[in-house]
Regions:
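N-terminal Lys/Arg-rich, disordered targeting/topogenic segments
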Residues: 1-24
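Solvent-exposed, polar/charged alpha-helical surfaces in well-ordered, non-transmembrane soluble domains
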Residues: 55-59, 68-72, 100-103, 127-134, ...
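Glycine-rich, acidic and aromatic/proline-enriched surface loops and short helix-turn segments
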Residues: 80, 99-107, 156-160
Length: 200
């Protein structure tokens, strides 16, 4: 029987180490493939979700005179196209609409028997949300650029916009943006604006 020199392993030890390495290598490859598969599926699902509401968004854009790309950007920012999304403050659906705003739309458009559950309907949510966005854009039409004011109002509310829109910022959007002391609202405006450019 051959003697082993110090530091040498028997035949079984020599075979076991490469097998373990091969197993680990295969596991790494399988894990990598699983991650890539999940990423491709997520990309495909996201694109499908974004396209699903294009017809309704076009309808809302035509009805209310709001840019198609802007409506789509607000939906992306608010809910990532999840029609069952519910916000911490009770915002509902694709455009994260407050119930009161939805009822205002229903009243203005003569929609009878309007109920809370109707706000979850994608078409109703997009039409009512676009109507609400349009009223905000109209509210600040006297400014050099109504968009940041309207988005700030949509995100943070009228009272905060009034506080930020003082002196020159009343009509100057650059000054207005500098006055916004909520980083989340500044980020919201920036992300919606960039996403709108992406959809144009």
């Amino acid at each position: 029987m051959a003697r082993l020199l110090p530091g040498q392993r028997g035949r079984r030890g020599l075979l076991t180490v490469p097998r373990r390495r091969t197993k680990r290598r295969w596991l790494r490859w399988l894990l990598l493939l699983a991650v890539l598969d999940a990423a491709v599926f997520y990309w495909w699902w996201s694109n499908q979700a974004e396209r699903r509401y294009n017809g309704i968004i076009r309808e809302a854009a035509g009805e209310h005179g709001v840019e198609y790309a802007l409506i789509k950007a607000v939906i992306w920012q608010e809910s990532r196209f999840r029609e069952d999304a519910v916000g911490d403050a009770g915002e509902i659906g694709l455009m994260q609409l407050m119930e009161l705003a939805a009822f205002e739309w229903a009243d203005d458009h003569g929609v009878h028997d309007f109920e809370h559950s109707h706000v979850y309907d994608p078409r109703t949510n997009i039409l009512a949300g676009t109507y609400y966005l349009k009223t905000r854009l109209d509210r600040y039409r006297h400014t050099d650029n109504p968009l940041p004011y309207a988005l700030a109002d949509y995100n943070a509310g009228r009272a905060r916009v009034v506080r930020w829109a003082r002196e020159a910022a009343r009509t100057n959007s650059t000054a207005f943006l500098q006055n916004i002391d909520f980083s989340s609202t500044r980020r919201y405006i920036d992300q919606v604006t960039h996403r709108r450019d992406h959809y144009q």
